[in-house]
């Protein structure tokens, strides 16, 4: 089965060659690399010209990483599609492992894996669990694992590892557990579900793969297949916390909130996920002095913490000594509950 590799890029002239080179090392005859240039204003086109017909260069109007990926999917010629961001890098064995798994298990719609991070001169291995809001096992998230070698041949230089096949649609409510640059998916079987949101400021990949997971089974390969070059910076501001929680609520509503069958079985899980994001929004409002708005938000939260309710009612209470620290600690406790989606390090495209 051939693979179409989609690489969106925007003003990454100094970095895109690293991504393309890693994709060239990973592909096989019949595969293709589609680089979608989201109207870069730097020397990206010149940097890619050297590859000639080894890649398909496509320049599109500037509409963001989600739209660029969607364009790449629309012009893909092969039955399998993989994604790589232009500032990241694949490990050489990614397509060998994932393609063989999908060939061995035609009932699996897509697969993904762990990854490693390079940031500020440091390396962090097996990074995916850092996205989780609480400690949990791969068995808990994806179902019992089996050895990869029991499903497909292992490359000589790769030690055996576990593969977990299961319902990612349920798992993605609990945790952000799919890293886009490690995904290989059956294009035609995923159909319209394989589409990235173009109206969201972030988490468009989370929504996309939640929709894909609703269509069919996913497989998690417990090995590293990619390097993410992290853009670590200062702690998120309250405004950013608010915006991200708002986006998460939008996705919860659009994906799971309209799925009656899912809600009939997992309403408590869904409600807890929504509750967590509403508390994050309320906390940001309180820190910003928007007490009336925070009260409105807290009315939508079952059993809202006393510290939040007090801060929304008493003028100035939030900004007095230990009170603000108690609210900050409350946020940490909230995020430990099983529902949030951990912010991904690194930017798409």
Show the residue positions of the predicted features.
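Short aromatic/hydrophobic "clamp" motif used to bind/position activated sugar donors
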Residues: 81
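Short, acidic, metal-binding catalytic loop of nucleotide-sugar glycosyltransferases
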Residues: 21-30
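A conserved acidic beta->alpha catalytic loop
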Residues: 22, 37-46, 62, 85
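Conserved nucleotide-sugar donor-binding catalytic segment
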Residues: 113, 138-242
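Acidic helix N-cap motif at the loop->helix transition within catalytic regions
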Residues: 17, 42-50, 89, 93
């Amino acid at each position: 089965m051939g693979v179409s590799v989609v690489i969106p890029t925007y003003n990454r002239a100094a970095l895109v060659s690293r991504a393309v080179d890693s994709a060239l090392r990973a592909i096989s005859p019949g595969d293709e690399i589609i680089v979608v240039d989201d109207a870069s204003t730097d020397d990206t086109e010149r940097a890619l010209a050297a590859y000639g017909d080894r890649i398909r260069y496509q320049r599109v109007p500037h509409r963001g990483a989600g739209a660029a990926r969607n364009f790449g999917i629309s012009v893909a010629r092969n039955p399998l599609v993989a994604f790589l961001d232009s500032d990241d890098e694949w490990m050489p064995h990614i397509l060998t492992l994932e393609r063989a798994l999908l060939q061995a298990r035609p009932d699996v719609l897509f697969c993904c894996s762990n990854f490693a991070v390079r940031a500020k001169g440091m390396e962090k291995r097996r990074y995916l669990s850092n996205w989780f809001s609480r400690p949990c096992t791969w068995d808990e998230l994806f179902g019992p694992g089996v050895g990869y070698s029991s499903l497909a041949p292992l490359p000589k230089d790769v030690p055996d590892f576990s593969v977990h096949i299961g319902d990612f649609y349920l798992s993605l409510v609990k945790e952000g557990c799919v890293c886009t640059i490690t995904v290989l998916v059956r294009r035609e079987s995923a159909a319209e579900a394989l589409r990235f949101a173009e109206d969201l400021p972030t988490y468009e990949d989370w929504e996309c793969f939640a929709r894909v997971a609703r269509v069919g089974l996913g497989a998690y390969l417990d090995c590293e297949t990619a390097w993410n070059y992290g853009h670590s910076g200062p702690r998120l501001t309250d405004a950013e916390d608010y915006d991200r929680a708002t986006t998460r609520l939008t996705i919860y509503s659009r994906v799971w909130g309209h799925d009656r069958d899912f809600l009939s079985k997992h309403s408590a899980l869904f409600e807890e996920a929504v509750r967590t994001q509403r508390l994050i929004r309320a906390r940001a409002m309180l820190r910003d002095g928007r007490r009336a708005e925070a009260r409105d938000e807290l009315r939508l939260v079952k059993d809202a913490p006393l510290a939040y309710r007090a801060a929304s009612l008493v003028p100035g209470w939030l900004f007095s000594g230990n009170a603000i620290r108690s609210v900050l600690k409350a946020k940490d406790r909230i995020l430990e509950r099983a529902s949030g989606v951990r912010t991904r390090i690194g930017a798409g495209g």
